Amino acid sequence: MIEPLLCGIVLGLIPITLAGLFMAAYLQYRRGNQLGA
């Protein structure tokens, strides 16, 4: 049995984590692009 609270926390953290990773990769890509140009 998984507690609804725990399930809600996990479901809430997953999109935030994915968004954070995507933002970090995007910023790093932009920074590398500017340095290359």
Curated annotation (Swiss-Prot):
Protein keywords: Electron transport, Membrane, Photosynthesis, Thylakoid, Transmembrane, Transmembrane helix, Transport
Coiled-coil spans in chain: none
Gene Ontology molecular functions: electron transporter, transferring electrons within cytochrome b6/f complex of photosystem II activity
Record's subcellular location: Cellular thylakoid membrane
SUPFAM superfamilies: PetG subunit of the cytochrome b6f complex (SSF103446)
Keyword NAD on entry: no
Record field: transmembrane: 5-25
Recorded topology in the membrane: Single-pass membrane protein
Its job: Component of the cytochrome b6-f complex, which mediates electron transfer between photosystem II (PSII) and photosystem I (PSI), cyclic electron flow around PSI, and state transitions. PetG is required for either the stability or assembly of the cytochrome b6-f complex.
KW Membrane (keyword) present: yes
Cross-referenced Pfam families: PetG
GO cellular component: cytochrome b6f complex; plasma membrane-derived thylakoid membrane
Family of the protein in this entry: Belongs to the PetG family.
Organism of provenance: Synechococcus elongatus (strain ATCC 33912 / PCC 7942 / FACHB-805) (Anacystis nidulans R2)
Record-linked InterPro entries: Cyt_6/f_cplx_su5, Cyt_6/f_cplx_su5_sf
Protein known as: Cytochrome b6-f complex subunit 5
BP-aspect Gene Ontology terms: cytochrome complex assembly; photosynthesis
Residues of the signal peptide: none
